[in-house]
């Protein structure tokens, strides 16, 4: 999922659909899995394993229930059990219980698990987000303008592969009589287009890329297809199969796939599709699998029950509560059957938490509650220990490797899910060579680089093999190739504006693509962008745009700069030219302007006031680096831009050629606690010949380039004010984080303008403006909500600006 607001909406829809579908078979017998015959064989193997242990002592099964964030309490329970030296012979778990149980089964100590869950950035782990630095400049700007984005429609080859899988697992008679493109009749064609379109829509808030890659970093040595009895401690987990509404009991397979499926909360994570199954969170069928432990013949069953019962009216307040209630509803029958099975039941007191309580404070408290709940059962556990006798949990195999702390050597690198040509292209981008030791950071850098191409739904990795050197396999899942996006904003300058975007082939790695963007409302514009991306060399681009700007349409304030103009622009340029950290683009531009003469009111500077209608030919080049970690509220990084344009010809009227140089820089210079100091500097100089009026310097407002591309922001002036040929603005923002997503910013800036640099410093010819403001910001899912009060020496008046939504 590539957009947060879109994800929240689809999350709710997916939850409702999942609950509705599974509720229809809510009373299906929960203990019978999707493959009873295979499950029976696996069960016999486990029974034989326990029988052998029983020759020496009673056998012990540890069952960990699901519960989302509440599952962190399992670590505290395991820590206490280890302190009593109670041996565990098999671990069973569902959802988060499956995750924690798998770590224990892989040989991780409670102390290591404690450290791991505290080190996870859960806000990132539960999404597919990658650091902003891996995303292309164009994609970054798209995401910072578009509120809802819907990728749609698979490529012909991807859809053909999908149909083959559907036919393989569902049966050809349930699909098409003949799989082909360019259908023989209109009904076939319509059906294929419809199914392709609907099938390409997102199935969850996230595909689970980040959480899957967490598993991959912790399970090295156990990532091949295997019997889970061969883990250091035998392990079983449960998922829910949506087609049959039966539990999928994982006794063997790929451990990462099992873990990803057992905690695939509908709507939060996309379902796991494997071997003809559509798998979601196991809690919807068997959230507390003590019945499986009983069937395998464990003599002693210790259960950790995180169920909080049904919530009442006052307790259903947020997404986490709704998800918890839905899971409890669907798994209620199996839970009621299983709850009395354990010999000892440990119930941490976690009523104030829900499935999504992953903040640092909650995680620490939940973990401690697990310790306390286990300690509360000390008498019962001591009694069990006397029955079991001496001994402790023994690992049957080597521990898994955590590549967070222990780099591993790899023998080869393969990228699956792409063509040979694309594989070579991506191999060059990631730059990982075989026969070297690599760390988690190196692998995640490669994964993020590939995912940052915006060509895949998700990118995951595996380290196959039981010992070094391992095979690094990067798995790429192609997604839809087209997209539709919409953004919206209300502010006090333009009232309501809507941004629409439609892209064809924009999620392809290579080849031609087309993108169309239109702004509807005050000062509308439309832009068509065609580009051709190759495996090597720069991207070739052609843009054509129309823009109408009328600053006098709404009388909401005063401005010295009255502007009404019509603009048509064509550009032919090269992009994706890399120069160290800079993205470079260069090309040829034709700019047609038809200006209203009112624009000349109160304009200072050495400009050509006669060229109000003309087409201007120019060549230009831009260098830009952007390392901010967030486009709106960064806490680290910088932006640096350098631009040059040479306007050399007027197609309708003769002009004297002139130049324009621009420079901008912004950084988060210092952060102390909740305070961030953000200095910035921007400058533009138009010189040589007789610069035409459309190229004059402009400053004001909160959005750069709102009325003219060269407009610079200035705290203290709304709308826009025309300035002389040289304009420089120095600014510092002091941003204080009040609490989560809420900020208060003090802004101070100074602008200086002069007609010629040789006159700079001359009191009579240099014009300076001081501006200051105080801004409150809320970082909402629909974009920043901001209100600022400001003042400038330009008019010696105070002003106000309100914005709700993304800037565009």
Task: Mark where each language-model region is.
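C-terminal hydrophobic structural anchor segments
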Residues: 735-768
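Short loop/turn motifs that connect adjacent beta-strands in outer-membrane beta-barrel proteins
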Residues: 507-513, 535-541, 577-582, 629-638, ...
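Acidic/histidine-enriched alpha-helical segments
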Residues: 311, 382-399, 519, 637-640, ...
């Amino acid at each position: 999922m590539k957009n947060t607001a879109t994800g929240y909406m689809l999350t709710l829809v997916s939850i409702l659909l999942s609950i509705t579908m599974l509720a229809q078979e809510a009373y299906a017998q929960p203990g019978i899995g999707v493959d009873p015959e295979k499950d029976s064989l696996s069960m016999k193997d486990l029974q034989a394993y326990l029988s052998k242990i029983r020759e020496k002592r009673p056998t012990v099964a540890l069952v960990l229930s699901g519960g989302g964030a509440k599952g962190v309490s399992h670590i505290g329970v395991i820590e206490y059990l280890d302190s009593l030296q109670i041996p565990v012979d098999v671990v069973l778990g569902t959802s988060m219980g499956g995750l924690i149980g798998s770590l224990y089964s892989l040989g991780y100590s409670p102390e290591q698990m404690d450290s791991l869950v505290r080190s996870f950035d859960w806000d990132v782990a539960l999404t597919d987000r990658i650091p902003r630095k891996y995303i292309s400049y164009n994609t970054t700007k798209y995401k910072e303008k578009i509120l809802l984005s819907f990728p749609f429609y698979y490529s012909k080859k991807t859809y053909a592969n999908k149909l083959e899988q559907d036919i393989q697992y569902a049966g050809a008679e349930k699909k098409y009589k003949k799989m082909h493109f360019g259908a023989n009749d209109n009904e076939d064609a319509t059906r294929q287009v419809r199914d392709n379109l609907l099938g390409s829509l997102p199935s969850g808030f996230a595909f689970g890329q980040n959480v899957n890659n967490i598993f991959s970093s912790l399970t090295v040595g156990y990532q091949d297809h295997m019997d889970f009895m061969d883990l250091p401690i035998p392990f079983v987990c449960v998922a829910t199969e949506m087609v049959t509404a039966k539990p999928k009991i994982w006794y063997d397979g790929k451990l990462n796939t099992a873990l990803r499926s057992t905690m695939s909360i509908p709507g939060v994570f996309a379902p796991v599709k494997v071997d003809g199954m559509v798998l979601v969170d196991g809690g919807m069928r068997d959230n507390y699998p003590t019945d499986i432990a009983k069937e395998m013949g464990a003599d002693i069953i210790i259960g950790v029950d995180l169920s909080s019962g049904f919530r009442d009216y006052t307790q259903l307040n947020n997404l986490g509560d709704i998800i918890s209630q839905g899971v409890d509803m669907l798994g209620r029958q199996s839970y009621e059957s299983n709850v009395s099975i354990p010999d000892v039941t440990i119930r941490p007191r976690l009523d104030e938490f829900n499935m999504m309580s992953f903040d640092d404070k909650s995680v620490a408290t939940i973990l401690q509650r697990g310790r306390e709940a286990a300690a509360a059962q000390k008498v019962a556990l001591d009694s069990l220990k006397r029955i079991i006798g001496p001994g402790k949990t023994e690992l049957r195999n080597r521990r898994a490797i955590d590549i967070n702390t222990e780099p591993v050597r790899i023998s080869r690198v393969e990228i699956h899910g792409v063509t040979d040509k694309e594989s070579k292209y991506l191999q060059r981008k990631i730059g990982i060579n075989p026969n070297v030791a690599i760390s988690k950071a190196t692998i995640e850098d490669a994964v993020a680089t590939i995912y940052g191409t915006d060509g895949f739904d998700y990118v995951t990795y595996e380290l196959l093999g039981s010992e070094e050197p391992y095979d690094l396999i990067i798995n790429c899942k192609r997604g839809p190739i087209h997209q539709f996006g919409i953004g919206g904003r209300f502010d006090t300058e333009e009232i309501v504006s809507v941004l629409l975007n439609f892209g064809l082939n924009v999620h392809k790695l290579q080849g031609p693509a087309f993108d169309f963007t239109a702004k509807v409302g005050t000062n509308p514009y439309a832009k068509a962008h065609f580009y051709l991306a190759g495996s090597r060399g720069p991207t070739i681009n052609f843009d054509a745009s129309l823009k109408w700007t009328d600053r006098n349409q709404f009388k909401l304030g005063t401005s010295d700069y009255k502007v009404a103009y019509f603009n048509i622009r064509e550009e032919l340029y090269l992009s994706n030219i890399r120069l160290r950290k800079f993205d470079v683009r260069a090309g040829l531009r034709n700019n047609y302007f038809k200006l209203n003469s009112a624009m000349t009111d109160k304009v200072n500077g050495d400009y050509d006031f006669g060229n109000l209608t003309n087409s201007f030919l120019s060549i230009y080049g831009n260098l830009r680096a952007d390392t901010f970690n967030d486009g709106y509220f960064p806490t680290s990084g910088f932006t640096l831009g350098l631009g040059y344009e040479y306007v050399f010809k007027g197609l309708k009227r003769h002009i004297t050629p002139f130049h324009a140089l621009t420079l901008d820089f912004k950084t988060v210079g210092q952060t102390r606690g909740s305070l961030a100091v953000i200095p910035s500097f921007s400058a533009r100089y138009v010189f040589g010949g007789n610069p035409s009026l459309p190229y004059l310097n402009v400053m004001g407002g909160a959005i750069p380039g709102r009325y003219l591309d060269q407009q610079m922001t200035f705290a203290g002036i709304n709308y826009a004010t025309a300035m002389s040929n040289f304009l420089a603005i120095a600014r510092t923002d002091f941003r204080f984080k009040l609490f989560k997503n809420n900020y208060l910013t003090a802004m101070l800036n100074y602008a200086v303008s002069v007609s010629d640099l040789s006159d700079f410093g001359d009191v009579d010819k240099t014009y300076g403006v001081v501006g200051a403001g105080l801004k409150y910001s809320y970082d909402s899912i629909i974009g920043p909500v901001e209100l600022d009060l400001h003042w400038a020496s330009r008019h010696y008046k105070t002003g106000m600006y309100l914005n709700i939504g993304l800037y565009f």
